[in-house]
Design a protein with these regions (language model features):
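Catalytic alpha/beta core of large soluble enzyme barrels
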Residues: 1-10, 18-25, 36-52, 62, ...
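Internal maturation/activation junctions in enzymes
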Residues: 47-57, 65, 72, 77-141
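A broad, low-specificity signal for short, low-complexity segments enriched in glycine/proline
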Residues: 33-36, 96, 107-109, 220-222
Length: 299
């Protein structure tokens, strides 16, 4: 029922909501609370549903599942802390005086949101005679919905400050045609090839069935002074792991969907860091590991 790993278990359905942090003002604590307070009942109300299948009813009786997630966390913190936070990331998130101050502020935001979610969900359950879930927060993969607001998915950094967004449409789709009218580039989908297996280059070729619409995109903080000088692709695996564990320790009660990008020389430090965190009881760890594209190309 859940291939993504943000909720662990068996015989259950996920009731999930997501807050788009990239749309919130870091200085507006009340606005943040309102967003997470609204997300709580939006998942808790689904606990009123009665399953027809007995094993699902029993699973919910044992452990009612809800999960309030977020996306755009990286964007939110860039807006909160500015370019110095990005430069600290580029340095590996070291535990300097500045770094410890950043971590303390990150943790404060995360813990505040978690408390708000718990209070909202439990208040709803108490008022409607429902059993309280004992875990209310998670971070789901968030890739598709993040496209709606241009958020960096989940807690992850974006791939770059500026990039080309490619969206697949069927050929002659009205939205794709509108994008073309507004100046977007259109190319054949990678599934469209000629008799020799070569990619087509004409979107109006009769053999073409799908289009890729190319939309130039920049993150919301791309024009902050100095922000575009930070090479995001060089963020270390351990820096990513450290930030992931901040989320896991201070916000997430279920599990944090995490994909860590690495190069070969980072495998041992990452393995040691994961092992040490488990040994120190710092929280459940479940990571997807992906080699960086430049590391694969160098092989």
């Amino acid at each position: 029922l859940n291939p993504c790993g943000e909720i662990l278990g068996a015989d259950f359905h996920c009731n999930l909501a997501e807050v788009h942090l990239n749309r919130l003002d870091p200085d507006d604590l009340e606005g943040q609370s309102d967003a997470f307070r609204a997300a709580g009942p939006s998942v808790a109300c689904l606990l009123n549903h009665r399953f027809e299948v007995e094993r699902y009813r029993q699973s919910r009786a044992w452990d009612p599942i809800v999960g309030v997630s977020f996306t755009g966390l990286f964007d939110f913190f860039v807006h909160a802390f500015g370019t110095p936070w990005l430069e600290w990331w580029a340095a590996g998130r070291p535990e300097t005086a500045e770094g410890l101050a950043f971590k303390e502020q990150e943790a404060a935001f995360l813990a505040r949101w978690k408390t708000t979610v718990n209070e909202a969900v439990w208040d709803y359950c108490d008022r409607h005679g429902l059993r309280r879930p004992n875990r209310c927060t998670t971070v789901q993969p968030a890739g598709t919905k993040s496209l709606l607001t241009g958020a960096a998915p989940g807690w992850h950094p974006p791939k770059a400050q500026r990039f080309i967004r490619r969206i697949t449409f069927r050929k002659n789709d009205p939205v794709a045609l509108a994008c073309m009218d507004y100046g977007s580039s259109i190319v054949p989908s990678q599934s469209d090839k000629d008799e020799q297996g070569r990619l087509l280059d004409d979107p109006f070729d009769p053999r073409c069935t799908e289009w890729l619409v190319e939309i130039p995109t920049e993150v919301s903080w791309a024009n902050l002074p100095g922000a575009d000088q930070v090479e995001i692709n060089n963020f270390s695996a351990m820096a990513q792991f450290d930030f992931y564990m901040q989320v896991q320790q201070h916000y997430t009660a279920h599990n944090t969907s995490a994909t860590i990008e690495f190069r070969e020389n980072e495998i041992e430090p990452l393995a040691e860091g994961s092992h040490a965190s488990i040994g120190d009881g710092k929280g459940y760890i479940s990571e997807a590991l992906v080699a960086r594209i430049d590391a694969i190309a160098a092989c």
